[in-house]
Amino acid sequence: AYAVKYPASWDFSQVAAGANDASKRIQSIAATCPETKIVLGGYSQGAAVMDVVTTSPIAGLGYTKPLPAAAVPHVAAVAVFGNPSARLGRPLTLLSPDFGARTADLCNTNDPICSSGDDFDSHSSYPESGLVKLAAQWITKHVQQRKTSTANS
């Protein structure tokens, strides 16, 4: 596990710093451990970090380390919770042609950060809602599929 380094706060302009750190780490793992299947995850602002990493092939707005195409196959799955872009009708599954099919963009019912809901408690209750367990099962399936497809190619 790796905790992305960035100043998580209400200041969403810090997302670029997190995206730079995550991209740098992904690229490093892909280069030094090419057989490793990487799983990306994020919650709330961390989900926004994953949005940038997986959808921005060019630098901009403080994001200076875009993920090169060669690193994309090393990511087996992406799971995000409480993703702010989903509230705008743009979940990560739609935003990213490279990662969409490998992505679970999960939102609790009535979570106001990722839906039009108004229950702020639901934004902090992902473990209790069962979505974390569901995501873990989904990730396991995708990692196993990537191992199988890599072994057969």
Model-derived features: positions:
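Active-site catalytic motif of lipid deacylating hydrolases and related acyltransferases
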Residues: 1-37, 109-136, 141-153
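Serine-dependent carboxylesterase/thioesterase catalytic core
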Residues: 19-100, 104, 113
